[in-house]
Amino acid sequence: MFGKQKNYSAWLLIAAIAAALWLPNLFALGMFIDGIVDAILAQSLYLHIGSFWEPKSQAISWSWGTMPLSIYLLSLFYKILGDHFWVERVYSFLCALLQLGLIYQLWKTLFAYEEAIKKQAWLPCLLWIICPLTGWCYGNNMMENTMTLFTTSAIIASLSFIRTQKNILLSSFLVALFLLLAFITKGPVVLFVFALPALFIGMNENFNWQLALKFSFLQIFSFFLLAVSLFSIPEANNFLHHYFEEQIKPSLGNSSPTDGARYSILLLLTITIFPFVLMSAIRFGINKKTLPNEKMYWRFLLLGLCGSLPIMISNKQRQFYLLPAMVPFVIGFAIYLLPLIDWLNEKIKESWQQKIIPVIKYGSIATILLCMVLCFTQAGTFVRDNDLLSDLQRVNTLTKNETAICADDIFFEQWSLKDYLLRLYRKRVCMSNENVKTPFYFTLPNQTGEHLPAGSKKIMAGKTLDLYQTPQ
């Protein structure tokens, strides 16, 4: 479909898909709750509430269960761009673009001496961006977006040494540094990259098990030294202690806030990579020839499994935890699909290629331009939680500069309402037992509420809540 000299059309297609995934909603409202919470903590840091090692917000005294690096990086964007609701989307969009660049560089590093394959760097980038998990994560401000930048950088640094056998100390230090940065972004799930040297023994004739063992030792030792140096800082050590107690122990124990079957990650992984498996089955049906790089294909698939299967240790099973592991998966599947690209180039006549390529080229350009227009015409619209966000806009108008609103106890677990109100309007929802003076009160629609003060007047009837003004 793409001639050897026409790879630019593939890059245009990738740009068009990226534009379609993220530009129309770049300035829209609505996000998965984890992304909102992370944005609240970053916003609080920007407002000088809490610190790097002591994250908290107006509504949360401390948030020890969240590693701080991505929060800190996002807070820098608030300092640069201002406290706007779209800043976290811009940050995630830039992470997505950087991630595409890193996948491109990973492929170039892997096939540095194979010019024909190196030119197909668009293929893993295309697989990455058409993966539904990718579009969802970068559209919802997930911490995995930042973490994946660091784990991919660590993979590149490790492969660079395996390819050249030069600068083993520098390469080991870089791998360790990137993994430490990934660790303080999301936690220990990043450590799967340490498996890479063992999996790539024999990648070339000079990289034997002795050198792999030495390289692994230097990586782990460097990581240990860097981690000990960092967490010997009292504030960092205090954070790590609380993180272990509030995040690691519950997730490894018998209960956690997001309990699920320990093996559900296998189903989630199957769902995530199913499109690639289907494409691989088509490729196998068309061309059963043995891959020249078959061992490389299996190495990357095993590395992807190293990043996925250990999640079974935890009670917490979420599909977006798989994002860092998807990088080796897309590289592996791209290697397997290379013969399919060659087959398409052979079977599709040059005359047809000359017709198809302009369609892709100009269709992609048109898509990008359309998405740029939608980026602004869709600004301020809702992409999820429409009724709730619409109600909260009215609440903000009616409560003006009020920073707290009292509510029935039933609202205690209305996390989306509380988090949206805090993130978008800096207003905190307080329960009836809190000693907070505020002239406003939430109840469920068409209900008087358990603790609504006598004489209160309903000033807004919404779809998700009613707002009362209480007597002063």
Model-derived segments and their meaning:
Residues 90-114, 153:
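Transmembrane-helix motifs of polytopic, lipid-linked glycan transferases
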Residues 373-471:
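Short periplasmic/luminal acceptor-recognition loop of GT-C membrane glycosyltransferases, typified by
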